[in-house]
Amino acid sequence: MSLCLGFRELGLQPYEPVLEAMRRFTEQRSPDSQDEIWLVEHPAVFTQGQAGKAEHLLVPGDIPVVQTDRGGQVTYHGPGQLVAYLLLDVRRLGFGVRELVSRIEQTLIELLASYGVSAAAKPDAPGVYVDGAKIASLGLRIRNGRSFHGLALNVDMDLAPFRRINPCGYAGLAMTQLRDLAGPIELDEVRTRLRGQLVKHLDYAEQTTLTGGID
């Protein structure tokens, strides 16, 4: 089946309204609905996944904490981090959860390789790593064969808030970002490259930019 993947570029948006819009989209979509990926940055926020434990929030301070329904544990979102929410009919695509995670990781690995950065996945810890430091996090939820939530790639951001938590439940996990590995980076360029890699690795025939809000 020839499928077109739609992208919405949302800019900087508060986390909770986007979370509610993702849930609403997933609940209301039909078998014929186009798959969408929402590209967004968030103001500073910690999010707790379904497996999250309070002890991994070390010193949240003035950064809000939001409980969410994605997989995984606590992570941090902030400006300069590229977040992609994958609103896909994975049943229609024919992917299992493990294959979807693997395809997302390979998307990120090839994207980073295009900047000369050698990255890898870990079989026991979803995400993408460079020399043991985490550069991208994954957290998904599948409901009725449809995915939501997605990935977060550290591009050009303040990494200090990660020290207030045990990222993804791992004490002392080092975090890194593309700017520190490849020099000054334009987020818009990374966004464009990410779109192309997602289309390739998720087996879509083409992509389009969607307009309008997510309300």
Curated annotation (Swiss-Prot):
InterPro entries: aa-tRNA-synth_II/BPL/LPL, BPL_LPL_catalytic, Octanoyltransferase, Octanoyltransferase_CS. It comes from the Bacteria. One of its GO terms (biological process) is protein modification process. The keyword Transferase applies. The keyword Cytoplasm applies. Pfam families: LplA-B_cat. Keywords: Acyltransferase, Cytoplasm, Transferase. Substrate binds at R70, G71, G72, Q73, V74, T75, Y76, H77, S137, L138, G139, G150, L151, A152. It is found in: Cytoplasm. It is an enzyme of class 2 (transferase). Pathway: Protein modification; protein lipoylation via endogenous pathway; protein N(6)-(lipoyl)lysine from octanoyl-[acyl-carrier-protein]: step 1/2. The active site is at C168 (acyl-thioester intermediate). Its EC number is 2.3.1.181. It catalyses: octanoyl-[ACP] + L-lysyl-[protein] = N(6)-octanoyl-L-lysyl-[protein] + holo-[ACP] + H(+). Residues 31-206 form the BPL/LPL catalytic domain. The record marks K134 as: Lowers pKa of active site Cys. GO terms for molecular function: lipoyl(octanoyl) transferase activity. GO terms for cellular component: cytoplasm. Belongs to the LipB family. In the reaction, the free carboxyl group of octanoic acid is attached via an amide linkage to the epsilon-amino group of a specific lysine residue of lipoyl domains of lipoate-dependent enzymes. Catalyzes the transfer of endogenously produced octanoic acid from octanoyl-acyl-carrier-protein onto the lipoyl domains of lipoate-dependent enzymes. Lipoyl-ACP can also act as a substrate although octanoyl-ACP is likely to be the physiological substrate. This is Octanoyltransferase. The gene is lipB.
